[in-house]
């Protein structure tokens, strides 16, 4: 409860307005709309370079850390209807990226790895749909 009050007080002092956007900005978490856009690009963008550029530009514009993006995406992808083997592989690749980030690996390299993991997941889903 104290943490919530501290967050609300900090948000009010910084922005003089307490909204979802200002709270997320104050605590440094990516906003839901940003994560939705990133997940949309990861699931639907066929051009790897374009996907990388979209996400990288958003990260720079909003000051987002890839580790925070990974955490938020992890929460959401459990709601996506992936086949179990695809979801397991995707979660393993995401956890590997998070571990490499924690050990000091480049965010650009790990962003590319994250995009590659989703491209791989999409290919496995398409192959599974074709063979079913």
Give residue ranges: language-model regions.
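AAA+ P-loop NTPase domains with strong preference for DNA replication initiators
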Residues: 1-132
């Amino acid at each position: 409860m104290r943490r919530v009050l501290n967050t609300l007080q900090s948000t009010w002092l910084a922005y003089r307005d307490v909204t979802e956007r200002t709270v997320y900005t104050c605590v440094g978490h990516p906003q839901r709309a940003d994560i939705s856009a990133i997940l949309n690009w990861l699931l639907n963008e066929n051009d790897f370079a374009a996907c990388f550029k979209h996400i990288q530009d958003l990260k720079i514009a909003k000051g987002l850390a890839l580790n925070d993006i990974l955490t938020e995406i992890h929460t959401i992808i459990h709601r996506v209807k992936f086949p179990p083997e695809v979801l397991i592989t995707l979660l393993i690749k995401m956890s590997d990226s998070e571990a490499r980030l924690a050990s000091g690996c480049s965010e650009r390299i790990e962003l590319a790895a994250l995009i590659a993991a989703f491209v791989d997941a999409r290919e496995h889903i398409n192959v599974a749909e074709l063979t079913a």
